[in-house]
Curated annotation (Swiss-Prot):
The gene is HMGR2. Glycans are attached at N199. The chain crosses the membrane at residues 166-186. Its EC number is 1.1.1.34. GO terms for biological process: coenzyme A metabolic process; isoprenoid biosynthetic process; sterol biosynthetic process. Gene3D superfamilies: 3-hydroxy-3-methylglutaryl-coenzyme A Reductase, Chain A, domain 2, Hydroxymethylglutaryl-CoA reductase, class I/II, NAD/NADP-binding domain. Its main location: endoplasmic reticulum. This is 3-hydroxy-3-methylglutaryl-coenzyme A reductase 2. Catalyzes the synthesis of mevalonate. The specific precursor of all isoprenoid compounds present in plants. InterPro entries: HMG_CoA_Rdtase, HMG_CoA_Rdtase_cat_sf, HMG_CoA_Rdtase_CS, HMG_CoA_Rdtase_NAD(P)-bd_sf, HMG_CoA_Rdtase_sub-bd_dom_sf.
Amino acid sequence: LESDFADMDVIGISGNFCSDKKPAAVNWIEGRGKSVVCEAIIKEEVVKKVLKTDVALLVELNMLKNLAGSAVAGALGGFNAHAGNIVSAIFIATGQDPAQNVESSHCITMMEAVNDGKDLHISVTLPSIEVGTVGGGTQLASQSACLNLLGVMGACKESPGSYSRLLATIVAGSVLAGELSLMSAIAAGQLVKSHMKYNRSSKDVSKAAS
């Protein structure tokens, strides 16, 4: 930089426009790392029998909670139910930088009824997933084993960068599944019931089972 701009004084190597580890509108505008959109159509039968709810209720809940509710809260990147839970779990398991969960969890979840209102179309848009498959924590034994399990360990010599791109799509797909699961549980009134039923804090876990 100094060779190109002789009169410039370098105060610091970063001016924070990079927005590393910070929520920022620029991540939505320009993207950062990998920008991924993942979508799926869930058949009416699956919504009713497996998810125990219905399409219209899910669409309404998503609009009121993830969109309107997040807007009222002044959310910058959090127009979703719990993308951060999924992203941080995968990041820790695969040796990513956990602090980059901040911008990598930027996500907007959309739901709409399709096919004459019978089926559910769900999509998640994550504009700034920051992942890698070489260096850093990816070299740790457990983390490299997880990457190997996913088929994205190390560098791809035939197509440089393809493993990190694939890992980003895995993250997005997992986020979509997590969004569908939690939103269905809330719509069906099962979230609180399951927490109360399986809440381990109600048991003395310090005592070994006899």
